[in-house]
Design a protein with these regions (language model features):
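Conserved ATP-binding N-box helix of the HATPase_c
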Residues: 1-19, 90-115
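Short acidic helix/loop segment immediately C-terminal to the autophosphorylated histidine
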Residues: 12-26, 49-50
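Short beta-to-alpha transition helix within the HATPase_c
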Residues: 29-32, 36, 40, 53-70
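Conserved short strand/loop->alpha-helix "switch" segment adjacent to the catalytic nucleotide/phosphoryl-transfer site
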Residues: 52-54, 71-104, 112
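Short beta-strand/loop element within the Bergerat-fold HATPase_c
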Residues: 116-128
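Glycine-rich nucleotide-binding loop
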Residues: 118, 140, 169-176
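Acidic ATP/Mg2+-coordinating residue in the GHKL
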Residues: 136
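ATP phosphate-binding glycine-rich loop and adjacent ATP-lid/helix-beta elements
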Residues: 142-169
């Protein structure tokens, strides 16, 4: 899986270079960034010893550190986390990691126009449900749209049988995912 993702990322990078600075190059770079994010989610999950039950707080903490590092030191310093220990099965952890990655990319892209700004990521558990929140202090208004990332988030939230809520923080936006911890409970 990891080799395939690396290969796709390389091909996207080559295609982007051939397109110069047009809209196709921008789209290809965005696609490459998303493939790299999926690769990070996948590789981070399978570094652990136990791959059936995942400590989501540890997994998200490591994933956020990796993503922050890939976005640069200013972004890494701007991300704050408050992660309660929550255990989920590996399949749900991958899905949650992909949703989190997309929410971080959206905040980076829309709240701050790519410039570093504060991101707050929290994970909590209550009544057999987890709550994963990504909040920013940016310009707000970047709620679910019709683009690829929004469609992917909706699909992934559906796989979890979860709910996504958007709240205007004035300034900024808070996005909260609620989903059952154990899908059979």
């Amino acid at each position: 899986m990891q080799n395939s993702l690396t290969l796709v990322s390389s091909f996207l990078g080559l295609q982007a270079r051939d397109q110069a600075d047009g809209p196709a190059a921008v789209a290809l770079q965005e696609a490459r960034r998303r493939v790299r994010a999926v690769s990070t989610v996948h590789s981070r999950l399978y570094r652990g010893d136990n791959t059936t039950t995942i400590d989501l707080s540890r997994y998200i903490g490591e994933l956020v550190t990796d993503l922050g590092g890939s976005m640069g030191p200013d972004w890494a310093a701007a991300i704050q986390t408050d992660l309660a220990p929550v255990c989920v099965d590996a399949g749900r952890a991958v899905t949650l990691g992909l949703i989190l990655t997309e929410l971080i990319i959206n905040a980076q892209k829309y709240a701050y126009d790519g410039q570093p700004g504060p991101l707050f990521i929290t994970l909590a558990e209550a009544d057999d449900q987890l709550r994963l929140t990504v909040a920013d202090d940016g310009k707000g208004g970047h709620q679910a749209g019709k683009g690829f990332g929004s469609m992917m988030i909706r699909s992934l939230v559906g796989q979890l049988d979860g709910q996504l809520a958007y709240r205007d923080r004035k300034p900024g936006l808070e996005v909260t995912l609620k989903a059952r911890i154990d899908p059979l409970a």
